[in-house]
Structures are given as C-alpha cells and as structure tokens.
Design a protein with these regions (language model features):
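Membrane-embedded helical hairpins/re-entrant loop segments and their flanking transmembrane helices
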Residues: 56-98, 265-282
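Anchoring transmembrane alpha helix of integral membrane proteins
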Residues: 1-70, 74, 84-87
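Transmembrane helix-loop-helix hairpins in multi-pass inner-membrane proteins
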Residues: 1-29, 33, 100-213, 295, ...
Length: 354
C-alpha cells in the first residue's frame, strides 16, 4: 500500500511540476482559446489514433491467445469467465491493454503494466503459460519495431535529426541505445538462454564479492524462469511464423499511429508549411528518446523535448496548445480511460459470484 501511495504522489508531483514549468508566464487565456479553436474533425481523428494505439495491442493479445487456443483440442479449451460473463473476447483483450497502459503510465520505466495484465488474464481463466507467451511476444515485437524505426531514422535521416533535435540529439542516441540493449538482452534470453544464465551467474557473483548484493538463490530462479518463458515464446513462434508477421505488421501500424496523431493536431490548429514526414519523424524521435527513462509516463522530459523540437514547426501561439492536445490525447486521455477500465475490472473481481 505504501508503495502505491508513493508511486501516486511521485506521479502527481512530476505532473504538477511539468505543467507549472511549461505554463508559468504563459498567457493562459490565449492557450485556452487556441485549444478551443482546434478543428473538431481533426480532434476526433487524433483521439481515434490514440484509441487505436491501445486497441491495437489488445487485438494482438486476442489474436495470439485465440491462435494458441486452437493448438489444443476443443475438449481442453478454457473459457474465461468473470461472474457469468464470457470475457475471452476481443473487447476483454482490449481491456487488458488499457489496464496495462494505466499501470505502465504510473510506474517508472513502464514496468508495472505486464505483471498486472498477467494477473487479470490468469484471474479470467487463461492458462498462465499462454498468457506469459502472448505478453512477452507483444512486448518483444514492440521493442524490436521501435529499435528498427530508430536505427532506420538514424541511418537515413541522421543529419536532419541532429539539426532538428539539437541539444536533445544525445538523449535520442541514449534512448535508442537503451532500447537496443533491452532488445539484445531479450533476444539473448530467447535464442541463447544457457549463455544468459551463465553471464548472469558471473555478474551476480561479482556483485556479491563486492558486497553490493547478498547471496540470494531466488535471483537465479527468477532468471531461469525469465529465460524459460522467452524460450517457450520462441518455440511457439517458430511453429507459427505467419502469426509473427501479422503481429509485426500491426505493431508497426500501432507505432506509427501515435506519431501520426501529432500531425492531426498540426492540421487541426490550422498550421501549414511542414510535411507529414517531418512531423512524424520529430514525434518518433521524442518517443524513442524518452521511452526507457525511469520516470512515470516519461513525464516532464517528454513535454520539454516536445516544446524544443517542435518550436520551428508550430507558430508561437500554437506550440503549447499543440503539446497540451497531443500529449493530452496520447497519454492523459488514455491514462484516464485505463483507470476507468481498471476500476471496473477490479470491481468484477471483488464482487461475490452467485
């Protein structure tokens, strides 16, 4: 309970400091008027892209869970039930995605989402092994697609990125490097699990020797479970390469949707003169730079970087409104929706069944 309270206080504190810093000294009435004048059709389109971002993950969870169900005999197929309601549906899987988004948004480095998703999936009656493989597959592909996009941007648009990002270019490189390391660790666990265990044993031994850690056999158990789960995911994907291609394609569209959202805001505020490619490139660079930072929802740094890199793109009076709308839709709007879905799901779990 204390940990949850601390996380909430940290989240709200960072949010308050972020918006205080950004709005201090600004003409709030002009900002309000600019936001109010946002084109409704473009606002709806931007909100739709934000919802698609979360729903796409839910659709992938549903697609993979359904595919794994088909591998078993019809007699052993498990139905998920909350109360008397069947919930092994696309809608329920989308709910898992909203729950994951909420907990990822309020925990540092987005570490809280998957464990809670797994908890609800297991409570609904999904096999723990299937749920683990599905969530790990979605997470791995998510990171791989992000790294591929980041490396591609660096190779083909490196000069433009360095010019546009200026002082934030090193942060982009750091974000890309951290994501690349994360992908490398996961791929090592998937493809070379025994090597991963040996390397971890050596690292743990050094930390114990330096009195940084105390001996704890549970650490190795967790690493073996970690590598074993990813190994199971690899084995399943090898047997279903077509499923992997579908997930990669949907993940790519999912990634691009949140980048395209900013361009909808750009058009909705009546801006012109900057191509869709440049707006998407800049938004993608912001996302990659902050993705692995240990801040709840990457608050603060996301807004500060946005204000810097998009300053030449938006007119002076539209820059802050554009940030409030785009960030409001792709994070805070989805966070509130996720909180609502989480509250309803928690109520279902705690209500007595008859």
């Amino acid at each position: 309970m204390k940990k949850k309270i601390l996380q909430t206080v940290l989240f709200l504190g960072i949010m308050f400091l972020t918006f205080y810093t950004l709005l201090h000294g600004q003409n709030l009435s002009e900002i309000y008027q600019a936001v109010k004048n946002m084109s409704v059709p473009y606002l709806i389109a931007a909100a739709g892209l934000a919802l698609f971002f979360v729903c796409a993950e839910g659709s992938m969870i549903w697609y993979l869970l359904t595919s794994m169900r088909k591998k078993t005999d019809s007699q052993t197929t498990v139905l998920c039930v909350v109360g008397k309601e069947k919930v092994c549906s696309l809608w329920r899987c989308i709910q898992y995605s909203f729950i994951g988004f909420f907990y990822s948004g309020i925990t540092p480095s987005a570490t809280g989402g998957q464990p809670v998703q797994l908890y609800y999936m297991n409570k609904d009656g999904n096999k723990g092994s299937d749920s683990t493989i599905v969530l790990m597959t979605v997470a791995v592909i998510y990171k791989i697609v992000l790294v591929v996009l980041g490396v591609g941007m660096l190779l083909f648009c490196g000069g433009a990125l360095k010019t546009e990002l200026q002082s934030f270019f090193p942060l982009y490189l750091l974000g890309l490097a951290l994501n690349t390391v994360a992908v490398a660790v996961v791929l090592a666990a998937m493809l070379f699990p025994q090597w991963m265990i040996v390397v971890w044993a050596w690292v743990e031994k050094q930390f114990i020797r330096l009195d940084i850690w105390k001996a704890n056999p549970q650490r190795m158990d967790k690493v073996q479970t970690f590598t074993g789960n990813y190994r199971n995911a690899v084995d399943w994907l090898k047997q279903h390469p077509g499923k992997l291609i579908v997930v990669i394609a949907v993940t790519f569209l999912q990634r691009c949707s949140v980048f395209l959202l900013t361009y909808m805001v750009y058009l909705g505020l009546g801006q012109a003169g900057t191509s869709i490619q440049e707006v998407v490139l800049l938004q993608a660079s912001v996302y990659i730079a902050v993705d692995m930072l240990p801040l709840p929802g990457a608050q603060g740094i996301t807004e500060l970087m946005y204000r810097s890199v998009f300053a030449p793109v938006f007119s002076k009076g539209s820059l802050i409104p554009s940030m409030l709308i785009s960030r409001g839709l792709n994070f805070y709007f989805l966070l509130l929706a996720g909180a609502g879905v989480t509250a309803v799901s928690y109520t279902h779990l705690t209500l007595p069944t008859t």
